[in-house]
Amino acid sequence: MHMRTKALVLRETAYKESDKILTLLTQEAGKLTASGRGCRKKGSPIAAGCQLLVWSDMVLYEHRGRWAVQEAAVEREFRGMRDDLVKFALGCYGAEVTELLAVEGVPNPELLSLLLNSLHALDKLDRPPALVKAAFELRCLCPAG
């Protein structure tokens, strides 16, 4: 089964010599785990779309009960945030909190939108990172119950 979706990479874990295990937050399927086969190889066509905190248009396919990335095209990579260690650390913190709150296979567009807006604020807006973090945490309370 194939699925085309937009996804944000919440976590990446090196696996074998050239693969990654990715935790994705998608619009349609919620949180899911997928393998990025060969995405650590030099010149891989899916490498850019399988980076941490990258919003990508992905084609996923199910292989032996697990999802795998077939195609990944970068939609937004939040480059300005990656140049500042504090902002990048807060982005990773937001991804970690989101991963804990999201349920595998259950769509949560509110949580996805909140994380994307927070990453945009860290990347483009001239807001203090502590203010963005506080707003993110407060707004996470609603989806968390």
Predicted ranges, named:
Residues M1-G145:
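Non-catalytic alpha-helical scaffolds and adjoining flexible linkers that form interface surfaces
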